[in-house]
Amino acid sequence: EYFEGANKFKAYHDENFASLVVNPSKPAFSKPSTIIMVIGESASAYYMSAYSDAKNDNSPWLRSLRGNDNFIIFNHAYTSKCQTVPALERALTEKNQYNDKEFNQCVTVIDIAKKSGYETYWFSNQGYISDADTPITMVAKTADHAEWLSEDKALKGKYQYDGDLLNCLKKVDPTKNNFVVLHFMGSHEDCINRYPQSFAKFSEPGKFDMVLNY
């Protein structure tokens, strides 16, 4: 089903994109700016000290931003589905749990950014091709630039931490308007492979708290 939907998305995308009209009322920024959207994986606010009375202070930086007028700590975010692919199909496109729109007939957040004049990037620490990732990969490949750490020959056979995605930001031209997606591996199993040992500060190896702290 996912492969079939992805193939249809690819077939219809150019037509859907061509028909999309975006008319911003005014420029969002007075000078070239970069917007970064981070997509996590298997993280829960119920286990983060920034949002709850978690046993361990595993998100101290985020918690320190409470009360800072330049940040919004949003407490009531919910996913529309409990599995990665159907959730992201709805998060990244106009498809949602309230309409009957098919994934392959939808425009995406990447499309809107492009039509708004942004250079678009997608950097991922997720897998490039698999049964689960294919629809997400189709959306990612519509960006002007799309890269997967798993496809880097220099990193083959090694665990790539999400922090490695920061090196990709060096490829983004700060003199342009940019929209950048960073797709994390996050807390996806096995947790023990998701953080450097320097962040192993709570309880025992492999605990969820250590990934959130990283």
Feature map (PLM): residue ranges:
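Active-site-proximal segments of metal-dependent phosphoesterases and phosphodiesterases across multiple
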Residues: 198-214
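Active-site-proximal alpha/beta segments of enzymes that process anionic O-linked groups
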Residues: 1-37, 42-203
